[in-house]
Amino acid sequence: MPFILPSQELSGPQGGLWLDNNGVHINAHGGGMLYQNDTYYWFGEHKTDGKGGNRANVGVHCYSSKNLMDWTDEGIALKMSEDTTSLLVAGCILERPKVIYNELTKKYVMWFHHELKDQGYDAAMTGLAISDTPSGPYEYIRSLRPNAGIWPMNFPDSSKEIKTRLDDLERGSEEWKAWSKEGGYLRRDFEGGQMCRDMALFIDVDDRAYHMASSEENQTLHIRELTDDYQDFTGKYVRVLPAGRNEGPAIFRKDGKYYMITSGLTGWKPNPGKSAMADSIMGEWTALGNPCIGTEEEENTTFESQSTYAIDMDGKGKRYILMADRWRPENAIDGRYVWIQIDFDENNPILKWENVFEGK
């Protein structure tokens, strides 16, 4: 049974730095959580000093805890390769690593957003690594753009034909917005595979796993079904909230409904949060608006943070905490963490300042 964080520990800010067992600020940004063997494992991006620290110079860091408060440094779970022919080398971009456990293969499966070295954010790939143990080491398998040559399940035949090309449109114009919503970028990337940037993983009650990512130049989310071993894509996927411009997805299930909390597109700067709901993971998603309740500044910045993962606090899908990042792009290693209890007003997820936890 997962540990239940006492309510008093969520009653407001408790400082800035969150120290591990060595007295060092936890270095696991854009992270996610795995609960296995009565232990929480926190995986995240290992940042280094300065602006250059936003690149993957080290790898994915892992920490373990029995109570979500006191964290033990488990080291680097996935290291950058020393093989210069590998795609996963120091200086590339690796963001938002997430890990799930596969009961069939007994493997721990990590997916992450991967950009190639010296190519900015053009590659927009997702990477895969696997391990026999939760804290690693993880073996890098490959990176790809998924579902090449496959249309989404909810994409109409009438939209599959190219009618207008991107070069003919002014980015940001009403014509461009309509083109994007109709699937212009999806059609552009059809042959080579769909883009993957900010991402999340989710295991449903039937043990089927899904990969969600900001796709189509971050204009539209895709939810993609994974194979039984969680190491590939089945080809079944849907477009979610077309042209909704969502990043930082955190997805969870409560009382038979599926929810997500996301952010808008403002780079490293915080912005108003977003939320959405669906009756099924691959079904129609309905936008619910900004879940934040607080001052105008708090609501407009999601308490100066960006969502990354929703922690199931009781193992029953009844109580969740949103993990979020407070980015420091000028000195990446100094990024902070904000955890917010997710309340509900009927079917609407709510984030309140009095339920914010910022570390110890």
Task: Give the positions of each predicted feature.
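Carbohydrate-active catalytic/glycan-binding domains of CAZyme proteins
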Residues: 3-360
